[in-house]
């Protein structure tokens, strides 16, 4: 049986799925929630079992929250969006997966959202020089904080949807206080607070 968990932060609803089912079991579940015809071709192109399960879990979460009449599609940039002939004012979405967890964030229409989660903080620690300046690294006291910065920058990248946006230099961690990370985007003249 699928494991769902929901979290609401302000006007963003996040649904989580712990991957325990096979792809066949998940396809069967999805077919009870929505018409799978629009998904068949793309699904057949996914080779790895784990990736198939992640892909299906994201769609199950979307249809659980939004009903059968929606379809997950992608902008040219790769950012997912919801489409429907019948339903108006569909939420914005962002999708992430790591380890055995899949999450989909839903926000009100025209209020973009970005989400990321990572199961392995040691990987972020090993590659920290690729996405954090020396100054940023001094601000982040341990591997958990470095992981938070990685997730924040990934989520911001998804949120901004700007091809070529660089993690190093164009997204700058300013401070980490009480579980909130402040990240500046100097070229865009923006500042983002990440929970």
Question: Whereabouts are the PLM-identified features?
Answer:
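Core catalytic alpha/beta fold that binds nucleotide/phospho-ligands
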Residues: 1-195
């Amino acid at each position: 049986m699928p494991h769902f968990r929901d979290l609401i932060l302000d006007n963003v609803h996040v649904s989580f799925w712990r991957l325990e089912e096979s792809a066949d079991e998940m396809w069967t579940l999805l077919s009870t929630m929505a018409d799978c015809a629009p998904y068949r071709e793309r699904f057949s192109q996914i080779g790895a079992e784990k990736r198939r399960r992640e892909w299906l879990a994201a769609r199950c979460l979307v249809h659980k929250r939004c009903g059968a009449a929606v379809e997950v599609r992608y902008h040219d940039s790769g950012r997912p969006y919801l489409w429907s002939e019948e339903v108006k004012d569909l939420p914005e979405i962002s999708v992430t997966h790591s380890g055995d967890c899949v999450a989909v964030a839903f926000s009100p229409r025209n209020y973009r959202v970005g989400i990321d989660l990572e199961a392995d903080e040691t990987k972020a620690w090993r590659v920290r020089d690729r996405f954090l300046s020396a100054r940023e690294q001094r601000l982040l006291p341990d591997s958990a904080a470095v992981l938070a910065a990685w997730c924040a920058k990934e989520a911001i990248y998804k949120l901004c949807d700007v091809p070529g946006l660089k993690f190093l230099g164009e997204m700058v961690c300013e401070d980490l206080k009480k579980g909130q990370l402040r990240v500046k985007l100097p070229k865009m003249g923006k500042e983002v607070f990440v929970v």
